[in-house]
Curated annotation (Swiss-Prot):
Pfam families registered for this protein in UniProt: HGTP_anticodon, tRNA-synt_His
Official protein name in the record: Histidine--tRNA ligase
Keyword Protein biosynthesis listed: yes
Keyword ATP-binding set for record: yes
EC numbers on record: 6.1.1.21
Known catalytic reactions: tRNA(His) + L-histidine + ATP = L-histidyl-tRNA(His) + AMP + diphosphate + H(+)
One BP term from GO: histidyl-tRNA aminoacylation
Family membership: Belongs to the class-II aminoacyl-tRNA synthetase family.
SUPFAM superfamilies: Class II aaRS ABD-related, Class II aaRS and biotin synthetases
Length: 426
């Protein structure tokens, strides 16, 4: 049997992993500017953590969950999204306690799992960056969080980003709109896709989210949820729009956007960018003021977003963005003969301990092959170390581009490599 990775997964090899690490580090730096701290939750949760929060009727729960019973007959699921596990952790660890500074700002970076048809930018194991902010109902929280995502895209150089905005209002507003949508869609039930016929009975707002052609046609003239917002919901949404304008963040109102998860209320948003003529969502989120209470905590407002790392990296590549990834090596040691083997290890280790990147030959190859490796590694400096150099206690180091060279003692190399490097590279 030929052993291969499971369908819908990927191996991220070192060349690509460097891009991942760069994007993750920019995200971490950005979030820390906004006073967010990292949280790490388990990759698997009790099934109810996801099903009850995300929604029993959502596609995630009905079609896409990786769930199983463990040896203790506990119903377990691999996490399909990040918000529910973070809310569970927030409640379980009593981060709502008065001594904890509010709002509580958390971010996560990690794997999520959904059993769906693998396609471009969509895998069964995928990686998500997400943020959650607990404890502030202030519309400024909505705008700050949206602005943070916008700031991240600016730092990464992503172009043509458009903010799509909508409000789902309060539970009362949503209930009134739900009925209006049922009244509108019921006469055209037979024209809907099979999935949306089911959604019409279980959660009619999800019909607006459908990607099926017949469903898109059916909802073209559907009533707008913004016409059903109560006074408080309307005031919240107006404040969000005003603050976005104050920060010069352009937006478009998208009344058919409802988000695929059941826990959202008030502000919801997506950032969309154009890639090769197609619109792609790169980030989505919104407000969820009832979720903490649903998990047994006190009623606590929340706001957050998630973005897929695979999709973000695909957009970076398609938009031709070059990430400033350091690929050069400081020095390569070409090693000739068994008598130089031990000293080469001593020297390369001493150089690394001074904060430099260094590599040496371990395979006993001819000098030409070793120099070729130095070029492949983009080594700035190259040193040839043979038995005669070991006996003399010194060797020649060359600038691999200019060919300028200098003879240095091993003692200098092991204690003051910075000066040697500066001398040859300046």
């Amino acid at each position: 049997m030929k052993l291969q990775k499971p369908k819908g997964t990927q191996d991220i090899l070192p060349g690509d992993a460097a891009k991942w690490q760069y994007v993750e580090s920019v995200a971490r730096d950005t979030f820390s500017q906004y006073n967010y701290g990292e949280i790490r939750t388990p990759m698997f949760e009790h099934y109810e953590v996801i099903s009850r929060s995300v929604g029993d009727t959502t596609d995630i729960v009905t079609k896409e969950m990786y769930d199983f019973y463990d040896k203790g007959d506990r119903h377990i699921t691999l996490r399909p999204e990040g918000t529910a596990p973070v809310v569970r952790s927030y409640v379980e660890n009593k981060l709502f306690a008065p001594e904890v500074q509010k709002p509580v700002k958390l971010y996560y970076i990690g794997s999520m799992f959904r059993y769906e048809r693998p396609q471009a930018g969509r895998l069964r194991e995928f990686h998500q960056i997400g943020v959650e902010c607990f404890g502030a109902a202030n519309p400024a929280t909505d705008v700050e969080t949206i602005a943070m995502a916008y700031h991240l895209f600016e730092k990464l150089g992503i172009k043509d980003v458009t903010l799509h905005l909508n409000s789902l209002g309060s539970p009362e507003s949503r209930a009134a709109y739900r009925q209006a949508l049922i009244d509108y869609l019921t006469p055209m039930r037979d024209q809907l896709s099979k999935d949306s016929q089911r959604r019409l009975d279980e959660n009619p707002l999800r019909v607006l989210d459908s990607k099926e052609k017949e469903d898109k046609l059916a909802v073209e003239k559907a009533p707008s949820i913004l016409d059903y917002l109560d006074e408080e919901s309307q005031a919240h949404f107006e404040a969000v729009k005003d603050m976005l304008e104050a920060l010069d963040i352009p937006y478009v109102i998208d009344t058919n956007m409802v988000r695929g998860l059941d826990y959202y209320s008030h502000t919801i948003f997506e950032f969309i960018t154009s890639v090769e003529g197609s619109d792609l969502t790169i980030c989505a989120g919104g407000r969820y003021d009832s979720l903490v209470g649903y998990f047994g905590g006190p009623e606590t407002p929340g706001f957050g977003f998630g973005l897929g790392l695979e999709r973000l990296l695909m957009i970076i590549e398609k938009q031709g963005i070059t990430l400033p990834i350091e690929t050069e090596m400081d020095i390569y040691l070409a090693v000739l003969g068994d008598g130089a083997n031990s000293k080469a290890l001593e020297l390369v280790q001493a150089i690394r301990r001074q904060g430099f990147t260094a590599e040496r030959d371990y395979l006993g190859r001819k000098i030409k092959a070793q120099f070729k490796s130095a070029d492949t590694f983009k080594a700035k400096l190259v040193m040839t170390l043979g038995e005669s150099e070991v006996e003399a206690g010194k060797a020649v180091i060359k600038n691999n581009r200019s060919r300028q060279e200098v003879e240095v003692s091993f003692e200098d190399m092991m204690t003051n490599f910075a000066n040697i490097s500066e001398q040859l590279l300046s």
